[in-house]
Amino acid sequence: MDGVHPIAEVLSKAAGGDFPTVDGGWQRVEPWRPGVEGVVAFTGRAYLAVDDDVSDGTLVSLGPDGFGGASSPRLVSRLAGSGWIDSLDIVLVARGTGGEPTLVPRSDLRNHPRAEHATAVRSSVTTFGYAAPDDHTLVTLSRGLGGLTEVGVEIDPAKDHVGADLVRDALTLLPEGEVVVAACAPGNARALRAFLAAGFEPVASVQLWRPER
């Protein structure tokens, strides 16, 4: 699509403390990536990115609203059909810090499971890590939610890196002030604490699916 996607716009505003109106409403938007749909929910407001083979009437009949209805498992399952459904994640935002990067490009990590997952739902995925070839700590940067830069991280369990330090190192890969998003499962408390400690702030939830209707 041309221009800034509505999801990118609302997430960028949220990164600056400007959140959608809390009115219980929802808005339909076009998917930001072909073959991937999703729901992004804020406090009292939701956005459904669904392809045009689903009519407005069908969406309304599923009962979405901004107070949790748009993320209803029944609604998501109906829209996904027999397709893959991702977990319901917390969306966190931060800004790039620029500076001298500690991480280096690591094309050898492209087959890492986290990198493969990123490639399945995002675009322009690049992989970074620390320079030591035996260190499989991974950072992915990609075009993710709404076309914004999205970051994912995973520490090599054989190394003693601190999660928050890795996230901070990832932010140096981005120009100072650039909005970056991350999605984290609520049950992944270790990763969630790392993002929070590195300055990310929770602003919304997201659930993605690849529809097979």
Question: What is the meaning of each model-derived region?
Answer:
Residues 186-205, 212:
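Conserved active-site alpha-helix within GNAT-family acetyltransferase domains
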Residues 46, 174-186, 206:
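Conserved GNAT acetyl-CoA-binding A-motif
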Residues 85-94, 201-213:
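Conserved catalytic-core motifs of GNAT/GCN5-like acyltransferases
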